[in-house]
Amino acid sequence: NSGGGIVALHAALVRQTDWKWLSELGGCDFNSDSEFLEARVMVDPNAKDHPAVRGFGKSFLYKADWTNHDKSVTGIPGIQVLLRIDESTYEPVRDFFKTRGGKAMGKDHPIAWINTLNNGRFFYTELGHDVRSLDTKFGRTHIIEAIHWAARLNKE
């Protein structure tokens, strides 16, 4: 609320329903996830100039374990989706969660977004379960530029 910044990775939104402030910032809660798999990631056309995704084209293949949330953040006031994932290119719910009510998100599956709630800056990405999803050119750029954006170290 006072203009600070938060960069949240992967599990930051797991079971935060008791922490209303973080739930409001993130816009959703965890439902399930996939195995570590390659999938098609798409840059939201309205976000192509955001520093955390700029220069990576309209879509690309990427490996991670992909998180499913209890709802999409699309359309929530203050939230801008940066990346979405094409669930037709991978199996979105691993077996462990299939037997425990885990659900895929469908055609609207955001995987990275920002929220400019009040005066602060919040960045969330599904990357970061472990180093495998971060130790690539995209992973490093995505996180470093997110930190710069949240800390207001760049022009955006």
Specify the residue positions occupied by each region the protein language model found.
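Short alpha-beta junction capping motif
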Residues: 1-19, 119, 125
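Alpha-helix capping at helix-to-loop junctions
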Residues: 2, 15, 22-31, 58-61
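Solvent-exposed loop/turn segments at secondary-structure junctions
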Residues: 6, 12-16, 47, 59, ...
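Active-site histidine-anchored catalytic micro-motif
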Residues: 7-12, 25, 34-36
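Stable alpha-helical elements in mature extracytoplasmic
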Residues: 18, 48, 52, 139-143
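Oxidoreductase and adenylate-handling cofactor-binding alpha/beta cores
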Residues: 22-27, 62, 70-79, 128, ...
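Catalytic beta-strand/loop cores that center a nucleophilic Ser/Cys/Thr
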Residues: 28, 35-118
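Extracellular ligand-binding/catalytic regions of CAZymes and related secreted enzymes
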Residues: 88-91, 95-112, 116-156
